Amino acid sequence: LPVAAILLLVLLIAGFSVRYISFVSQTIYQESTSHLEEVLHKSNNMLKEMVRKNLTYLHLYNDFLENTSDEAEIQAYIEAAQQDTGFVGFYFLSYDGNYMTVTGETGYLGLQANLDEKLSKGEDIVMNTALPGKPQMLAFICPETQGSYRGFAYDAVAISYYNDAVLRLLDSSAFEGNASNYVIYPDGRVVID
């Protein structure tokens, strides 16, 4: 009888231990999931706000460009806007990705996708880009205004930020800087890493 009682006691302790470990594991999982959802929600809201704000700026710049043709005035306006908002570059952009800056610099803005289709729909665009020898950037593109600047025919205007600046904005103190950040499209393509 004492052996059966000890065996029963051991089985009860083992059963309670398994239930307790299961309970603790589930609690930790729920807390971790809740915290991660909170962090991701915060980052998502900050990214949405950044996109909304920068596309609004682009629409304001378009209004200015529609009413002004003086190159010096345009350059002064864009330089002041750059100081106020902190974007890296402002581009007059053609449908094929070629650009001209307000200072007259030309080149190809290495975009991840074909602009032609999106510009023809008149949609605002946010996409990853890179210039030779420079870090990756996030470009905000607005096709609202078409025109010519210094003889360069453009189909849209764009501003860009270096990805590290965008990630600093999105960085949360939740992981004390020990996390990797990715911004992805719904189809899984990485926008910022």
Report each predicted region and the residues it spans:
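Solvent-exposed, extracytoplasmic
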Residues: 71-85, 156-193
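Extreme N-terminal signal-anchor transmembrane helix of membrane signaling/transducer proteins, especially
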Residues: 1-26, 30
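Nuclease catalytic cores
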Residues: 33
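Short, hydrophobic-rich beta-strand element in sensory/regulatory alpha-beta domains
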Residues: 58, 87-93, 179-182
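Extracytoplasmic/periplasmic ligand-binding sensor regions of membrane-associated signaling proteins
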Residues: 84-86, 90, 95-165, 169-172
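A generic secondary-structure signal
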Residues: 42, 46, 64, 80-81, ...
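Histidine kinase transmitter module recognition
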Residues: 13, 46-50, 173
